[in-house]
Amino acid sequence: MTLRLADMTELLADKVQAELLGNSELLIERLSTLEAAGPNDLAFLSHPKYLGQLAQSAAGCVIVAPSAREAALKRGPCIVVDDPYYYFALVTQLWKRQHFPGAAPAIHASACIDPAAIISPHVSIGAFACIAAGAVIGEGARIAEHCVIGANAIVGANSRLSARVTVADDCRIGERCIIHPGAVIGADGFGFAPHDGQWVKIEQLGAVRIGNDVEIGANTCIDRGALQDTVIEDGVKLDNLVQIAHNVRVGRHSAMAGCAGVAGSATIGAHCTVGGGAIVLGHLRLADGVHVSAASIVTRSLLKPGHYTGLFPIDDNAAWEKNAATLKQLHALRERLKQTEKSLLQLQGSLEEKP
């Protein structure tokens, strides 16, 4: 299937004003990178450091910023917008709607739906999905194969749950959310009281509340709160294999990369990012606009916006072992340095006293 350049810009005109230069009748067959694109492909240039690739690219059309307009025109058709990366994201959404339209709403005969569940119009429910009593499925929602929606849980309008997603009892999913395969929303938080050498379970009586336009990656787990709810605010994006513990609150439009973990009762502000494999310890607070580098361990609250890194740099193993050994002695070296400074000051003082 193809899409005419003029049609593409027209369909997106209500969201972004773009200037189409060159052959507007060009038929786009594929979206691609600058390096791999062919004469009927659309690519994008989002960063000036890749400007050198532009002249070498065989792309039929390239989305560029105004600063790259002249360079792009020298090689052929281009779309000029203020934010090429954002525009390309909109193009991918348009492309998916045009080329991969969803199936018509239907409820599979093998789905198990409690009579007390509320199923809105235009809902799709896949094979062997289970919808418990009191659950509410909003209009236009899609529940894929083998999903489990617990008692009194809510799935908002036009949300999409992929195969094997679990939404436990009393948990709420907002509108237009996307939840990828295997995610578990509302499992018990990790709460136990030590008593006589044993661990006594603390029942997790809260739930999970997820806002609108949230995307949750495959096999990500968001635990229900112990007493209050775990909260994921509007627009949050979680990658695969992210762990959100009980009573955590994640502020609007924050994002976390794969294998990040947030321990219980931590608060992540709005517009934060947490890199892959990073860990935020429990009961800490990250202010709005905090960005944590991959593999960092956050051991204290970060109350000012900014970029934070907390990891030991990679090196060849021999050098790393030497640096690690030195790090173990850092406190002793600090004390020696203080004593040396003290001795030097005393020596300086004695020299100044001499006639």
Swiss-Prot record:
Cited SUPFAM superfamilies:
Trimeric LpxA-like enzymes
Q: What pathway, per the record? A: Bacterial outer membrane biogenesis; LPS lipid A biosynthesis
Oligomer status and interactors: Homotrimer.
Q: Which family does it belong to?
A: Belongs to the transferase hexapeptide repeat family. LpxD subfamily.
Which terms does the record give in the GO molecular function aspect?
N-acyltransferase activity
EC?
2.3.1.191
Provide this UniProt record's keywords sorted from A to Z. Answer: Acyltransferase, Lipid A biosynthesis, Lipid biosynthesis, Lipid metabolism, Repeat, Transferase
Taxonomy, superkingdom:
Bacteria
One family name in Pfam for this protein: Hexapep
The record's annotation in PROSITE patterns points to: HEXAPEP_TRANSFERASES (PS00101)
State the active site: 246 (proton acceptor)
User: Which portions of this protein are annotated as coiled-coil regions?
Assistant: none
What disulfide bonds does the UniProt entry report for this chain?
none
Q: Origin organism of this chain?
A: Polaromonas naphthalenivorans (strain CJ2)
Quote the catalytic activity from the record.
a UDP-3-O-[(3R)-3-hydroxyacyl]-alpha-D-glucosamine + a (3R)-hydroxyacyl-[ACP] = a UDP-2-N,3-O-bis[(3R)-3-hydroxyacyl]-alpha-D-glucosamine + holo-[ACP] + H(+)
Q: What is the designated name of this protein?
A: UDP-3-O-acylglucosamine N-acyltransferase
